[in-house]
Amino acid sequence: LGRLGAEHIMVVHSDDGLDEISIATETHVAEYRDGALSEYKLQPENYFSERQSLEGLAVENATESLALIIDALGKQTNANGAKAAQLIAINAGAALYVAGCAADMHQGVEMALDAIGSGLAKAKINDLATFTQVQQDG
């Protein structure tokens, strides 16, 4: 990917089979930055108080997925919403880090958690939904 012009990327795969950073188990990372490749492992407990089970996060359809995302970005009315918020935050934190908006993963995760807690993340999702609807109707 570096030969294709990428400046900073992370390729991730968790021990539980996710192709994203997991809150349940170790995640293997290959990070390319400034022309150098490094490999390391991320532990979810380095970002949150403890590892979380992925139980309750699998969804059957788009309606269930939307409900879980709304809960995760909102009041987190149940344990699944809180776990989903952590999963969103750790992966959004990685994106913020790779994009250069955060100095490191820890800062990226904190920024993502702040956006979720303040309602900013949910507002941005609502903006995207409105934009998408306007484009479909337009």
Language-model features: locations:
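Glycine-rich anion-binding loops and their surrounding alpha/beta cores
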Residues: 1-138
